[in-house]
Structures are given as structure tokens and as C-alpha cells.
From Swiss-Prot:
Regions crossing the membrane: none
The record's note on its domains: The N-terminal domain interacts with the head of the 30S subunit; the C-terminal domain interacts with the body and contacts protein S4. The interaction surface between S4 and S5 is involved in control of translational fidelity.
Subunit description: Part of the 30S ribosomal subunit. Contacts proteins S4 and S8.
Lineage of origin: Bacteria, Pseudomonadati, Thermodesulfobacteriota, Desulfovibrionia, Desulfovibrionales
Function: With S4 and S12 plays an important role in translational accuracy. Located at the back of the 30S subunit body where it stabilizes the conformation of the head with respect to the body.
Gene3D superfamilies to which the protein is assigned, alphabetical: 3.30.160.20, 3.30.230.10
The protein, known as: Small ribosomal subunit protein uS5
NCBIfam families to which the protein is assigned, alphabetical: rpsE_bact
Gene: rpsE
Residues in S5 DRBM domain copies: 8-71
One GO cellular component, as annotated: small ribosomal subunit
Biological processes, Gene Ontology terms: translation
Protein family per UniProt: Belongs to the universal ribosomal protein uS5 family.
């Protein structure tokens, strides 16, 4: 986990060397997938490509900062269970009780840590490709709605939860 000068948490999800085959041989370049979050419910991801690793990371980080979105959190976890889908992959995200921790792997864990989620259960289904898992997770998180937003949309008053 890397803390940037602006207070953002930056995580490199994948860094790949890719090759383009040309007449004279192979041309290598680098592809970087980065997740950026503030640890308080905002998270974004970016994909950067360049001839050198640092430049690919810089591009990905810049794109991730521009694509940041806010997700509703309740005491360090998600408000309700949700399924995010992208391509062949889907990611199931479940809220967890306090003290559970982040039970997720790879790209999902990176997103949750950067967003400031402390307790969550997650399972990636259908693909292990970090790009698709990342996009499926972000699709699920972007579909989350806070209780306040739902009550505003429905034009109803938000009541205190019954115990």
C-alpha cells in the first residue's frame, strides 16, 4: 500500500509487459492497472500504457484519480449485498460484521483497501482476469445506493431503523 503526497492510497493491481510483433522482431511496452482511493469511501481505477514502467504507472494513477467515485459505507462495510458484472466475470460483495476484515483476493482486495472498507466478504466468479474482476467490482460498487439517496428518489422520509 503506497501513500501519495496528496493523501491517496495507490495500489498496483497488475503490471504487464506486452509485445507487438513487427517485421524486425518484437516491440515491448508496459501496461499498468492501478487503483487509487482516499480511504474514506472514494475509489477509482486507471489503465496506463507506455514504453517504460514509471510512465505507465503515472498514466494509470492519473486516470484513476480522474475516475474516482464515492461509495456509501456504513461503519466500514457495504450497506447491502450486491453482484457486479463485467464481461464473463461477476463479483459478489457482501457486508460483514465488524472485525471480519477484508476477505477478498487480488483486484477486489485492492479496491476495498483503497476505498477504506474494513469488513467485507467477496467472491470473484467466472474469471480470474484482473481487468474484468476490477471492472465487475467497480460496476457493483457504482450500483450501491445509500438509504438517504433511495428515500430522496422515492420521495419518502427516511425513518430510523427498527431494532
Amino acid at each position: 500500500m503506497e501513500q501519495s503526497e496528496l493523501g491517496f492510497i495507490e495500489k498496483v493491481v497488475s503490471l504487464n509487459r506486452v509485445a507487438k510483433v513487427v517485421k524486425g522482431g518484437r516491440r515491448f511496452s508496459f501496461s499498468a492497472l492501478v487503483v487509487v482511493g482516499d480511504g474514506k469511501g472514494s475509489v477509482g481505477f486507471g489503465l496506463g500504457k507506455a514504453q517504460e514502467v514509471p510512465e505507465a504507472l503515472r498514466k494509470a494513477t492519473e486516470q484513476a484519480r480522474k475516475a474516482m467515485m464515492k461509495i456509501p459505507l456504513i461503519e466500514g462495510t457495504l450497506p447491502y449485498e450486491i453482484l457486479g458484472e463485467f464481461g464473463a466475470g461477476s463479483v459478489m460483495l457482501k457486508p460483514a460484521s465488524r472485525g471480519t476484515g477484508i476477505i477478498a483476493g487480488g483486484a477486489v482486495r485492492a479496491i476495498m483497501e483503497a476505498a477504506g472498507v474494513t469488513d467485507v466478504l467477496a467472491k470473484a466468479i467466472g474469471t480470474n482476469n484482473p481487468h474484468n474482476v476490477l471492472r465487475a467490482t467497480m460496476a457493483g460498487l457504482s450500483a450501491l445506493r445509500s438509504a438517504q439517496l433511495v428515500s430522496n428518489i422515492r420521495g419518502k422520509l427516511l425513518e430510523a431503523p427498527r431494532k
